[in-house]
Amino acid sequence: MDMRSHEMIERRREDNGNNNGGVVISNIISTNIDDNCNGNNNNTRVSCNSQTLDHHQSKSPSSFSISAAAKPTVRYRECLKNHAASVGGSVHDGCGEFMPSGEEGTIEALRCAACDCHRNFHRKEMDGVGSSDLISHHRHHHYHHNQYGGGGGRRPPPPNMMLNPLMLPPPPNYQPIHHHKYGMSPPGGGGMVTPMSVAYGGGGGGAESSSEDLNLYGQSSGEGAGAAAGQMAFSMSSSKKRFRTKFTTDQKERMMDFAEKLGWRMNKQDEEELKRFCGEIGVKRQVFKVWMHNNKNNAKKPPTPTTTL
């Protein structure tokens, strides 16, 4: 078998006025095949059409499949601004959709013509994504962020996901705190007695203050103004009447004379005499101390002079 091949390659460059001219490559292949076995002469001529390659026009197939993404449509719906946030409430103006006050690109375009609020206070909607989709997406992202970790600070939830603190119910195990130290009644069946009730006790009449008045007054003053204020506030809400000790006329006269003898104050050197006196008239020491505290101002007042004509 005898084969002859002749190949001629001609290259020609043409300048068509462009910065980068095209390259024309023409390949002409002529092949003559002699088949002596069959006795046939087959002449085959293969001609390749000329192809113009321009690297500016040739692009990879992947570049044609990638198209520029269209700009998403953004709309601003109802206004979510809470006008009572400073006082802990929840008040909305009822604006249903953002309406720019000016032309696009100006500062006035960022303010709503209906509610006069900034555009950021309105709910943002992109390509028809509603608030329910945004909530589900936020929950899904928040779950994966907590499960697998994520950098940066935690983003706040959408405004429609925020809860009003005034609408939260109290804890199920919540019980009011009772101040047993000041709220317990004495064994005798009386109610709670406060320093304020001592101040309003008064000096005259047949009913006087009991010994528990001054005892509580001394405790509250010793523990500070904070404990006294809390105890008085709790006592004002109590509906029980406080216990009062009644004195006879003879007891009041003898207590008046003995208080003037002591100078309306209890000194340490008079402690023995004070115990003996309280045992004689049948009055407790604390009861006498409270009575003296309530009546010393009235007893020290000088008598009003009488004018004679």
UniProtKB/Swiss-Prot annotation:
This is Zinc-finger homeodomain protein 5. NCBIfam families: homeo_ZF_HD (TIGR01565), ZF_HD_prot_N (TIGR01566). The record marks M292 as: Required for DNA-binding. Residues 1-16 have a biased composition (Basic and acidic residues). The lineage of its organism: Eukaryota, Viridiplantae, Streptophyta, Embryophyta, Tracheophyta. Mostly expressed in flowers and inflorescence. Residues 240-303 bind DNA. GO terms for cellular component: nucleus. It is found in: Nucleus. It holds the Pfam family ZF-HD_dimer. The keyword Zinc applies. Keywords: Abscisic acid signaling pathway, DNA-binding, Homeobox, Metal-binding, Nucleus, Transcription, Transcription regulation, Zinc, Zinc-finger. GO terms for biological process: abscisic acid-activated signaling pathway; positive regulation of DNA-templated transcription; response to abscisic acid. InterPro entries: Homeodomain-like_sf, Homeodomain_ZF_HD, ZF_HD_homeobox_Cys/His_dimer. Putative transcription factor. Binds DNA at 5'-ATTA-3' consensus promoter regions. Regulates floral architecture and leaf development. Regulators in the abscisic acid (ABA) signal pathway that confers sensitivity to ABA in an ARF2-dependent manner. Homo- and heterodimer with other ZFHD proteins. Interacts with MIF1, MIF2 and MIF3; these interactions prevent nuclear localization and DNA-binding to inhibit transcription regulation activity. Binds to ZHD1, ZHD2, ZHD4, ZHD10 and ZHD11. A zinc finger (ZF-HD dimerization-type) spans 76-125. Signal peptide: none annotated. The keyword Zinc applies. Disruption phenotype: Increased resistance to abscisic acid (ABA) in the seed germination and primary root growth. The homeodomain differs form the typical one by having namely 4 instead of 3 extra amino acids inserted in the loop between helix 1 and helix 2. Residues 1-21 are annotated as: Disordered. Its main location: nucleus.
